[in-house]
Amino acid sequence: NAKMAPYIYEEKNGVHILDIVQTVDELEKARIAFKKAKNVVFVGTRPQIAPVIKNIAEECNAHYVNTRWVGGLLTNWSTISACIQNLNDLDKLLEQDPKTTGLTKKELVQKEKEMERKEKFFGGVRQLSSLPDLVVIVGQPHERNAVLECQKLNIPTITLLDSNCDPSYTTYGIPANDDSTRSVEFILKQLVS
């Protein structure tokens, strides 16, 4: 992306080398914003990044989306929060002794399947009770819906900006390789420390 040109130090054999000095500067700005935020959601749904997102979010008691961004997660908060509440209710129901629930075996199996499906999409945001103060995004081109919802609601974002990203779509952009799990893990650990 041409808008990333100021963050590129040089190009070698068709590979862009990002300017590490700018990465450090932008990381420090983002870290200050992260420390001020009380309600943070991490977003990264690509298969190689998903486990890193989950681990980092759990380490700092934040929320996360690492399987698929459900459309309207932020912009349709009233409906989504009802789904999350339903997931929590299902969890309580299934924790009870099957004999005391008053459900048949078939109904219990259906409820378990429903819970598994909802857990897959909403498990990382189960404790989210209101819209977040800040959203951390890894893989901007892949997480376009999350980026657009944050923009629509004026929710600040911290984004790892690879050479294929657009810095104009984020509040705090950290130039870094967002394809490498080691790079993502290193940057996010620095951010939350």
Give the positions of each predicted feature.
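Ribosome large-subunit tunnel/peptidyl-transferase-proximal elements
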Residues: 1-134, 138-161, 165-177, 181-193
